Swiss-Prot record:
<feature type="topological domain" description="Cytoplasmic">
    <location>
        <begin position="390"/>
        <end position="399"/>
    </location>
</feature>
<dbReference type="GO" id="GO:0046323">
    <property type="term" value="P:D-glucose import"/>
</dbReference>
<dbReference type="GO" id="GO:0016020">
    <property type="term" value="C:membrane"/>
</dbReference>
<feature type="topological domain" description="Cytoplasmic">
    <location>
        <begin position="451"/>
        <end position="493"/>
    </location>
</feature>
<feature type="glycosylation site" description="N-linked (GlcNAc...) asparagine">
    <location>
        <position position="43"/>
    </location>
</feature>
<keyword id="KW-0325">Glycoprotein</keyword>
<feature type="modified residue" description="Phosphoserine">
    <location>
        <position position="471"/>
    </location>
</feature>
<dbReference type="InterPro" id="IPR005829">
    <property type="entry name" value="Sugar_transporter_CS"/>
</dbReference>
<dbReference type="GO" id="GO:0043204">
    <property type="term" value="C:perikaryon"/>
</dbReference>
<keyword id="KW-0966">Cell projection</keyword>
<keyword id="KW-1133">Transmembrane helix</keyword>
<feature type="topological domain" description="Extracellular">
    <location>
        <begin position="33"/>
        <end position="64"/>
    </location>
</feature>
<dbReference type="GO" id="GO:0021987">
    <property type="term" value="P:cerebral cortex development"/>
</dbReference>
<feature type="modified residue" description="Phosphoserine">
    <location>
        <position position="475"/>
    </location>
</feature>
<keyword id="KW-0812">Transmembrane</keyword>
<feature type="binding site">
    <location>
        <position position="315"/>
    </location>
    <ligand>
        <name>D-glucose</name>
    </ligand>
</feature>
<dbReference type="GO" id="GO:0015749">
    <property type="term" value="P:monosaccharide transmembrane transport"/>
</dbReference>
């Protein structure tokens, strides 16, 4: 197998795919900045309809629904990934669901003109479904078009798209840009533009060669696409691996979500996939970002919105750092470093918030702890859970596994968003100790259960888990970690 290169075709395909990740990040962060203005819109609209001032409880419920319905849509979308990718393919699925994004964007963008609370909530639900689908499509497509030696680095671009989307939403949400009383519908409806751009660019991207060969038996087209994407004529080894996997798939029926839970062969990789997704959300990162303005305000920052944007910049910078580290240090190592660093920062956040009234310097300690916490998140728990799921499963169960992992991520995101305010009100600064405890648990789990997938082919990883299932031992992680990874030489990639 020839040495794979970073070709313009590969970069273009991955970049276009990550527009879906950008959409997820943008729509996650876009609702926070105009909170007060949207509440005023809800109040005005209900007053006109009810001919009386709405109760405060009703306003709070509707606002919470506007925020939380996005995660409900994400759960629905993420669980529907397999329905699309097995029927339409990876690329065509991304193309089709942009229609959903455009519909959701239009509903949100015209909600104010129509004076319709229902349009706003329905738009958030629909855009959530779209983003849930994207969290499955994008990592799967990137993992299947990337060379083994570059799979981790390109997989990190999925997370980079998410954090750039969050940052853009924070900046555009400033009151002198689009976060004003007149322009906030444009802020929400802006999601239409990336959807149109991706729809225009996707026809120029290739379909996943693994899907073409394994699912459609189109070997010649898969070979041509691999040669073009990887910049080498010698892709015999990769094609043979796909053919072997295709033979194995033909001997067993397509894997459904239910069969994924029933089969002993899939138990260990599925457990790892779900726990890693939980480690991302129960690390507390979204709680910090959802309520970062208030946290910075409590810490004594005069303009907390700019401190929040600063945290978003740190978020983006360290995602880029992770991109360069992931193929050197490995997924497992970076994930453990990230979890450990976040646990320490959570303790420092608790201590500094408790002592900030007594010691002025503690406000500075709190801000630094938050920024370092965000940096550690993007080194490991941010990017790695998304793309490692695609690495742990072969072609047959991969769509179902992505659906289960994505749904667990969205569900845990929803739970954190729902219960963090109550927990913070009851526990105060001690709430971050809960996240520290979760982080320590996930660190121990990763140490004992998660294999290092750096430099492994999909076949290597799958065989290790199958061997573990047949032997009845929980040793796949140890077995993979003790193997020598595939190295880049003139004879392989």
């Amino acid at each position: 197998m020839g040495t794979a290169k970073v070709t313009p075709s590969l970069v273009f395909a991955v970049t276009v795919a990550t527009i879906g990740s950008f959409q997820f990040g943008y729509n996650t962060g876009v609702i926070n900045a105009p909170e007060t203005i949207i509440k005023d819109f809800l109040n005005y609209t209900l007053e006109e309809r009810l001919e009386d001032l709405p109760r405060e409880g009703l306003l709070t419920t509707l606002w919470s629904l506007c925020v939380a319905i996005f995660s409900v849509g994400g759960m629905i979308g993420s669980f529907s990934v397999g329905l699309f990718v097995n029927r339409f393919g990876r690329r065509n699925s991304m193309l089709l669901v942009n229609l959903i994004a455009i519909l959701g964007g239009c509903l949100m963008g015209f909600a104010k003109i129509a004076e319709s609370v229902e349009m706003l909530i329905l738009g958030r639900l629909i855009i959530g479904i779209f983003c849930g689908l994207c969290t499955g499509f994008v990592p799967m497509y990137i993992g299947e078009v990337s060379p083994t030696a570059l799979r981790g680095a390109f997989g990190t671009l999925n997370q980079l798209g998410i954090v750039v989307g969050i940052l853009v939403a924070q900046v555009f949400g400033l009151d002198f840009i689009l976060g004003s009383e007149e322009l906030w519908p444009g802020l929400l409806g802006l999601t239409i533009i990336p959807a149109i751009l991706q729809s225009a660019a996707l026809p120029f991207c290739p379909e996943s060669p693994r899907f073409l060969l394994i699912n459609r038996k189109e070997e010649d087209q898969a070979t041509e696409i691999l040669q073009r994407l990887w910049g080498t004529p010698d892709v015999i080894q990769e094609i043979q691996e796909m053919k072997d996997e295709s033979i194995r798939m033909s001997q067993e029926k397509q894997v459904t979500v239910l069969e994924l839970f029933k089969s002993p062969s899939y138990f260990q990789p599925l457990l790892i996939s779900v726990v890693l997704q939980l480690s991302q959300q129960f690390s507390g990162i979204n709680a910090v970002f959802y309520y970062s303005t208030g946290i910075f305000q409590d810490a004594g920052v005069q303009e907390p919105i700019y401190a929040t944007i600063g945290a978003g910049v740190v978020n983006t910078i360290f995602t880029v750092v992770s991109l360069f580290l992931v193929e050197r240090a490995g997924r497992r190592t970076l994930h453990m470093i990230g979890l450990g660093g976040m646990a320490v920062c959570s303790v420092f956040m608790t201590i500094s918030l408790l002592l900030k009234d007594e010691y002025e310097a503690m406000s500075f300690v709190c801000i630094v702890a938050i920024l370092v916490y965000v940096a550690f998140f993007e080194i490991g728990p941010g990017p790695i859970p998304w793309f490692i799921v695609a690495e742990l499963f072969s072609q047959g169960p991969r769509p179902a596994a992505m659906a289960v992992a994505g749904c667990s991520n969205w569900t845990s995101n929803f739970l954190v968003g729902m219960f963090f305010p109550s927990a913070a009100a009851y526990l105060g600064a001690y709430v971050f100790i809960i996240f520290a405890a979760f982080l320590v648990f996930f660190l121990i789990f990763t140490s004992f259960k998660v294999p290092e997938t750096k430099g492994r082919t999909f076949e290597d990883i799958t065989r290790a888990f199958e061997g573990q299932a047949h032997s009845g031992k929980g040793s796949a992680g140890v077995e993979l970690n003790s193997m020598q990874p595939v190295k880049e030489t003139p004879g392989n990639a």
